[in-house]
Design a protein with these regions (language model features):
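Bacterial Sec-dependent N-terminal signal peptides
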Residues: 1-29, 33
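Surface-exposed, glycine-biased beta-strand/turn segments
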Residues: 22-104, 111-116, 131-140, 145-146, ...
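Long, low-complexity serine/threonine/glycine- and acidic-rich segments characteristic of extracellular
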Residues: 145, 187, 202-205, 212-357, ...
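Low-complexity, Pro/Ser/Thr- and charge-rich linker/hinge segments at domain boundaries
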Residues: 176-199, 206-208, 270-271, 354-377, ...
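Short edge beta-strand/loop segments characteristic of extracellular beta-sandwich folds
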Residues: 241-245, 381-388, 505-509, 571-579
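Proteolytic-maturation and junctional protease-sensitive modules
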Residues: 396, 494-548, 585-587, 593-596
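C-terminal beta-strand-rich structural cap/linker in extracellular carbohydrate-active enzymes
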Residues: 423-434, 540-559
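Proteolytic processing hotspots in large secreted/extracellular or virion-associated proteins
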Residues: 445-449, 472-519
Length: 645
């Protein structure tokens, strides 16, 4: 095939880069790091570095703790505590230890720190009057030795259950793969597992089984390997996606595959080797996977090609970034090989048969289609039209501005004609078929890497050069009777991922008397509201978002809820909750003095932590809780001193 010579050159470079990366990482001896939970005892993981989560590549490893909190967490090597973070979300309670080799280990979702660190943190929290802190102690204030107990495991922050999250980072704070350091506590003899492969046409002239679009194929397992028995017919530019994951011994969890290689006729065309993930590029995860499939089905497909806007640098490919071109009748063997960190491997083998265009070989039609409809796949508009009763296909007339274009059907599926329009040629506003006109809701083509201002009657948007990964086709809409009294603003399709913030202005037709408590909320498919914020500027309300979809305006005039659980001289515990805009802040004072209250959003509880354990909690108690809309709830009570009882 035409790309073979290029592939051989790329492959040689790839092995050199791969070897250099491996050598740099493994300059650290295997026994340099101690396993931080029950060292020397067999353990299992709930997550690995490079695993596909719903919003990101998982970093580090999630070490299971038997469903309990409070296990000793050990320093992995000599060093000093360089950072301490406390947050109700994210990593929760976390320690960062810098080591003599320049690397940093991270221990997250902790229940509590050891006494000296704990007292230092509490002192800083009282000094700053804030539960959430990000501290950088003086170097060697807290020196540690390998094996020291530095904390106890927990479930703090955005943790779904008790475990220890453990990172190893290089001197630039990029995340490395802890399993590369050969911890004997983890056993993995299971090979990666494949569930599906997907092929996608990359332009309107390409076909898969003589059809345009994206098509998934189930696989058949044979030992640790997988096959697709029947050849898949292809023509033109084709991209490949893989739904696969790794598994480890004695655990049900799906974990990450760090290395995937795709070959055509024994020539490598794509390789990904995930050994390092820089946080500055982490949002590119949305362009590594098929984001649209994630949103529609929840499945996480690896793209085995480098899509436009993807800035990760752990790929090596052919000259077309992993996209395959088939233009000569021939049958080709594709092999996709997967390795996990422990070099367990499996492969998927299938044949691709390049044929010249003809009618589809598997005429299944489009079930339930009884009228014309359309969809967009990347840069192509696909129009489906039921063939008239006389059985004759008719050309479609596409209208774009003052121009019209007569387009024949690209192919026919049973009783449905399929018409393809390249949107980079121009945005059609309508199509006429059999004297029936269908209008398209495509309001603008928004380019990436350019600033762009969008204006409509109810929505305005400002896109920066970094807002988008790739060109999108924006559709906006407005419903003046949402939920009977509100209004709904439709801003694009959530099939598109967003790299960085888009500044959006909503221009409502309705009047909102209490603007101070009226804000923007995103609305999901189930009708749930999520606070997005916004500030009023004349008749517009402006906010920033990294999500396309539906938005509405809601006035929240209901204050948060406060429920006392424990109030005595030793401990204060409250449950706080807000049913719409969410908790923004809380503050508790005793005799006008600020009291530290830890916060766990999962349980909605706050609880007191004394600066001086010997000092009883007594006097005038005032707890103020404020939501994101500015509503405030105040609880007042008095704690009597012991000699007043």
């Amino acid at each position: 095939m035409f790309y073979r010579k290029t592939i051989l050159v790329v492959t040689g470079f790839m092995f050199a880069a791969y070897g250099l990366c491996y050598a740099q990482m493994n300059s650290v001896p295997d026994d340099y790091y101690l396993f931080p939970i029950k060292p020397g005892n067999r353990n299992t993981l709930a997550g690995t570095m490079g695993e596909l989560r719903s919003t990101h590549f998982h970093t580090g490893i999630d070490i299971r703790t038997g469903g309990v909190q409070g296990l000793p967490v050990h320093a992995a090597a000599d060093g000093y505590i360089s950072r301490i973070a406390v947050s109700p979300n994210g990593y929760g309670n976390a320690l960062y230890i810098t080591h003599d080799n320049g690397q940093t280990t991270v221990y997250a979702h902790l229940k509590e720190f050891t006494a000296p660190v704990k007292q230092y943190v509490i002192g800083e929290q009282y000094k700053r009057k804030s539960f959430q802190v990000n501290l950088f102690p003086p170097k060697y204030k807290f020196s540690v030795h390998k094996g020291d107990t530095i904390a106890h495991s927990g479930n703090s922050g955005s943790s779904a259950g008790p475990h220890l999250h453990f990172d190893i980072r290089n001197d630039k704070q990029a995340v490395l793969n802890p399993l590369e350091y050969n911890f004997e506590e983890i056993i993995d003899t299971r090979a990666p597992e494949v569930r599906k492969i997907a092929l996608k046409t990359m332009d309107k002239h390409s076909r898969i089984n003589n059809r345009f679009g994206r098509f998934e194929f189930n696989v058949i397992k044979s030992g640790n390997h997988y096959i697709i028995e029947e050849p898949i017919q292809v023509y033109g530019s084709i991209a490949v996606e893989l739904y696969a994951y790794d598994r480890q011994d004695w655990t049900k969890f799906h974990t990450g595959i760090n290395e995937i290689v795709m070959e055509i006729d024994n020539q490598e065309v794509f390789r990904q080797v995930i050994r390092e993930i820089p946080f500055s590029k982490s949002r590119n995860f949305y362009n590594h996977i098929n984001y649209r499939q994630l949103k529609e089905t929840g499945l996480r497909f690896h793209k085995l090609y480098v899509d436009n806007g993807n800035e990760f640098d752990f790929y090596t490919t052919n000259k077309d970034k992993g996209i395959l071109t088939f233009d000569t009748e021939c049958e080709h063997e594709m092999v996709i090989t997967m390795h996990d960190t422990y070099r367990n491997w499996s492969f998927l083998k299938l044949n691709l048969r390049c044929i010249l265009l003809s009618e589809p070989t598997a005429d299944t039609g489009i079930p339930g289609l009884d009228e014309s409809t359309y969809e967009i796949l990347d840069n192509t508009l696909i129009v489906y039209s039921v063939i008239p009763e006389n059985g004759r296909s008719v050309p479609a007339v596409f209208f774009s501005g003052l121009s019209s274009y007569l387009i024949d059907a690209s192919y026919t599926l049973d009783n449905v004609d399929v018409y393809l329009w390249d949107l980079t040629f121009g945005l059609p506003d309508s199509v006429e078929l059999c004297n029936t006109k269908e209008y398209f809701s495509i309001d603008a083509m928004i380019p990436s890497v350019k600033e762009y201002q969008f204006y409509s009657h109810n929505i305005e948007a400002s896109f920066s050069k970094r807002s988008l990964f790739d060109t999108i086709f924006l559709d906006v809409g407005y419903d003046p009777d949402f939920n009977g009294t509100g209004e709904l603003f439709l801003f694009g399709s959530d099939q598109y991922p967003v790299r960085s913030n888009i500044e959006v202005s909503l221009i409502p037709d309705k009047i909102y008397p209490d603007r101070d408590r009226t804000h923007v909320y995103s609305v999901d498919d189930a009708g749930n509201f999520y606070f997005s914020g916004g500030t009023w500027d004349g008749d517009k309300i402006k906010f920033k978002t990294r999500t396309f979809g539906a938005y509405t305006l809601v006035e929240d005039s209901i204050p948060p809820e406060i429920r006392p659980l424990i109030i005595n001289s030793e401990k204060l515990v409250f449950k706080i909750n807000d049913k719409l805009s969410g908790i923004k802040s809380y503050e508790l004072t005793l005799n006008d003095a600020w009291v530290l209250m830890n916060y766990d959003p999962k349980t909605r509880q706050i609880w007191s932590v004394k600066l001086d354990e010997k000092q009883p909690l007594e006097g005038r108690l005032v707890l103020k809780v404020t939501d994101n809309a500015g509503n405030e709830k105040v609880h007042k009570s008095k704690i009597l001193s012991q000699n007043q009882y």
